[in-house]
Amino acid sequence: MATSLQAPILGSRPPRRTLRFLSFALFSALVLVVASFSSRKSESGSGLRSGSVEPEYAWTNQMLTWQRAGFHFRTVKNYMNDPSGPMYYKGWYHLFYQHNPNYAYWGDISWGHAVSRDLLNWFHLPVAVKPDRWYDIYGVWTGSITVMPDDGRVVMLYTGGTKEKYQIMSVAMAADPSDPLLVEWVKYDEVNPVLRPPPGIGLTDFRDPNPIWYNTTDSTWQLVIGSKNDSLQHTGIAMVYTTKDFINLTLLPGVLHSVDHVGMWECVDLFPVASSGPLIGRGLDRSMMLADNVKHVLKASMNDEWHDYYAIGSYDVATHRWVPDDESVDVGIGMRIDWGKFYASRTFYDPVKERRVMWGYVGETDSGDADVAKGWASFQGIPRTVLFDVKTGTNVLTWPIEEVESLRMTRKDFSDIVVNKGSTVELHVGDANQLDIEAEFEMDKDALETAIEADIGYNCSSSGGAVSRGVLGPFGLFVLANQDLTELTATYFYVSRATDGSLHTHLCHDEMRSSKANDIVKRVVGGTFTVLDGELLSLRILVDHSIVESFAQGGRTSATSRVYPTEAIYERARVFLFNNATGATITAKAVKVWQMNSTSNQYYPFTSSN
């Protein structure tokens, strides 16, 4: 075990009146106060700042170079956002993505394209499609790719932006379906655009087509498109179309689902998950939509607030309607895919490992000038598997794909470290810029049973972060921290008491001290999750330079941050355990820390064989 350094943590608050303890951790969702964008499709990628404009920080080349991730998906250069058309095809994983091939900011949006054998090491291919027709001159935006079961054609259906910024659907096809790399794509000018917004839908509120089911009986696809209806109650909606060829499409009556007061839905996804029986632990192809013991996850990205929500329910393919199991946690008002900087997620089925894999992009929160100086902007989050949580029966589990573990190198183990109230313990792990951390925590049981303080209405975003002291939290880890803890990113648990006396457990990310720069967005984000009787609190953290991803309780919830330290970089980055609770001692039962290898990220060597 490493030598410990214990020091008081600054920041405190007076104790509150309390309620009697009843039970541990029930699921709830917290609404964070965030800045909203008027339209994601014209987003600059620079983040939003409140109040007066801060002067730009004097970034050095050394600082900017450090920010580049080592094992997350990244472009070779320039701007990236939404993942599009992920798939496995003829021995290669493909990822298409929204991309500005010319500059490190939003604009000239095209489909970037990369391939991999393992979802970690990537070859970048030529841009698949560019905005060069009247029907997509403002941007080739998010869409999907489908392999036709009858003749093997590979069809791209995408959202195009006209010069008026109207959103319409167009088709491109792989020029050579026998090419495993799918390098060349051909737009079908004679039929494009194949779809326009239907009556009642705004001309700029119609995007992100995604197939959800193939009916083998009549060889038709059902696909969803996201939108909103402001003539109702700022209602987010998903419409269902049918098609046999992705050229002739028919709108079905009604909508797949709608929720009032949540605004525009984009990047809608609907997929099956096994809820019981022999398929548990496996991802399901969309052909399993009608299988027994299957639930259906509806996910949508909320354009008003830039977060991805989901709900679990049932899809009736005959009526093309989806119904949530619990309306109180419907799409847009309940469960989040991730509480932080993670957006526009899209899943695909991996037939090789029989799993459903989710991609989501992680944008910048620094200044646009800093991105230009770096020459790139944004990452994709680590690809995650998605499974139904059979233990709770109420949520999904998202977890880093198993291939990530192949990047682990030197490992340090720590066990039974007691972290006293108001103290920190440094974990001497060596290079702390690329890490995979697994930790389990146990709280003093006497404190749980005797604590009577109430944190009524506690949520991470308005709590004051890791410096705010309560009886039962916060406690967790500081990563990307400097030695004197004046710069750090905190990922932690906080146990609070509700009005009924029950205890709720929160996973939070505190970015407020993550950088000494002022021209970046810094927030505290997070939400609650379920902890069952007998479970230790578990946390996995992936640290990859300026991106930090945390997963609690096996993936019941997660949070992602972009951070831009000025001092806690290179050899000056540190890791600490901390406990800022006023009424409980915390024991880190087991902490495992691996230094992580980097992945390759290069242009495809076309002089070699495929």
UniProtKB/Swiss-Prot annotation:
Annotated binding of substrate, by residue = Y79, M80, N81, D82, Q98, W106, W141, T142, R207, D208, E266
Entry's pH dependence statement: Optimum pH is 5.5. Stable between pH 5.0-6.0.
State one Pfam family annotation: Glyco_hydro_32N
As one GO molecular function, the record gives:
hydrolase activity, hydrolyzing O-glycosyl compounds
| GO biological process annotation, one example | carbohydrate metabolic process
Q: Give the first-level EC class, as a single word.
A: transferase
Protein name in the entry: 6(G)-fructosyltransferase
Q: Name one GO cellular component term.
A: vacuolar membrane
